[in-house]
Structures are given as C-alpha cells and as structure tokens.
Amino acid sequence: MPRYHLFTFTLAFGLLTVTALSQTASVALEQRIAHYDPAKMRASTAVHSGAGGMQFGNLVDVKYVTGNLIFFQRGVLNPHSSIGEHYHNRCEEMFIILDGEAEFTIDSRTALIKGPAAVPDRMGHAHAIYNPTDKPVQWMNVNVGMGPNYDAFNLGDSRVGVSLDAIPQFPSMRFDRALLRPMEAMDGGKGTAQYRRGLEPTIFSTPWAYVDHLVLPPGASTGSRALPTISEVYYVMAGAGTVKTGSDTSPIQAGDGIPVDINQPRSFAQSGSEPLEFLIVGVAKDMDAKVALMNAKPPARGGRALAPAGR
C-alpha cells in the first residue's frame, strides 16, 4: 500500500466514524475484546512520506466506547523505517513503542527514546517517528479528535539522519515499573496494585483525558468501578488475567485491547505467575467532562496510596 497515510488506511477499514453513543450494550464482552494478530496486519510503505515500511492495523473497535476515539492501532515499525513528519490540526495522536528504541520528533525537534514509551502529539503540532536500529520495533498508535474525523498534513520529511537533542524537548512517558506507586485495595480490590498517571489531562487539548500505567502483581485485583463521563481502553502489555464488565467475565492476555464504556462497571484480576500490566487510555465524552476532570481534586483513582515509588 505505497504512499498511503494512516487516514487512508483507517478509512479503508471502515472504522473512522465515531458515533455519539457506543454500541457496547448489545455485544458480549468476549466479542468486544480485541486480540493482536501480526498475521492480520497490513503492510504499508512511505507512511506520511516516511522511509521504509511497517505493518499495522486497527486493534480496538472504537464503536464500543463513547467519545471521539478515532482509532487505536497496533503494529510493527520495520528497521530503518519511519513515519514521516505530519501535522494534526483537529485531532491528537500518540505513538507508542513497546520495546527497543526510536527517534521521536515533535515540531522538527528529535530525540532518541527507549521503549516502552509514548510521545503524544498535541493538536496543532507535527510529529514523526523513526526506527534507526536493525530490529523491528513493536508499535502502537492512538488518535483522539475534537470531532469524529481524522486530519493530517504531510511535510514530506522522513526525519531520517537528523540531529538529535540529548533531552527530549516535548512531553513523553516511560512505562517504567520503577516509577509506579503502590495502591492498596485499588477500587476495593485485593492486594497492592502498582499505578501511575503518566500523562495528565492538561497535556491534551482534545477530550483525551489521560494515559495511565497499571500493574497487578500475582494475586492482585481491582474492585469494580464505573466512570460516568470517561471511556477507557486497556491494552495488556504483559501477563494474563480476567476482566469483568457488568455480569460478563472473559480471560485476557498480552496483546489484548479491552474497551470500557462510560457507566460500565469493570474489574480486573491477575492470573498466573507474571504480573498483569496495562497501558490505559482515558477519553472524556466531551470537553465539559474533560474540564470537570481537570478541576477535580486528586486522587483520580480509588485505593489508598502507600509510600511513593518515585516520580
């Protein structure tokens, strides 16, 4: 699919329209959960006038959440390949790498960041990503808009071989377990969860509310909780467990994406020997809900915080 950008790809998959209300209620939980399958990803070259190629596709079906989540994608950025620099003027996008390292660009300033990490591109700014290594990088992409439609303006710059800043001159988030904060009985659950809000609502200009990092150690769980104005998508970075929404329960594992709609009770439990690790994206149903979240007093999550584990 040479020289197609992410909008064209998303439109081809028929997932660009975001309805005012989701279709969650009529679909069983196990059907709403998305499972990453590399064999189903579509090859693309020169993405946003970038170098080389990649394989990617839509993971979570956005019709299962309320709000302007335009897409939630998963894929692989090939060695020595890039997504060229491009602007978003009515939406915001966040590139994520789950391993390796990549050169992230915001407004033509570039820095090398080791994964797992995420870099948001705020509305009205330009971004790009380049994999300078000899190994493929596991990649994700999330987009939230002011409305239901995606926009992009390509600059024709692959960002290959550019000079690097020693310190990134833009917001970023590392998914580093050493930075997590212990939360006892989170949302009324069992054991001690490890949690951090890595990107606050003030980072974003759209109804995008936050990006969180959550780890449930062996034997831990969260209690049931529903948010009246915020939808969430949970991506399982590692481990296995179960999710319960309402009366439905389903197993989950690494690579799964779980949409949780507004007013939908949800709880998670870890299983097996490996901690259950999540990347969480929160999207407000509208800007009024986003402003209310920003004006609310912390903490944003239930549970009792223990001694800080770092910033």
Locate the predicted segments by residue.
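Positively charged n-region of N-terminal signal peptides that target proteins for export
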Residues: 1-5
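Bacterial N-terminal signal peptides
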Residues: 8-20
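A short, N-terminal "cap"/entry segment at the start of jelly-roll beta-barrel domains
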Residues: 23-69, 84, 149-208, 223, ...
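Ligand-binding loop in jelly-roll beta-barrel domains
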Residues: 67, 123-149, 242, 254, ...
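Conserved short histidine dyad/triad with adjacent acidic residue
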Residues: 73-88, 212-227
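Glycine- and acidic-residue-biased ligand/ion/polar-headgroup-sensing regions
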Residues: 90-102, 229-242, 246
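Short acidic-glycine-tyrosine-enriched beta hairpin
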Residues: 109-124, 247-263
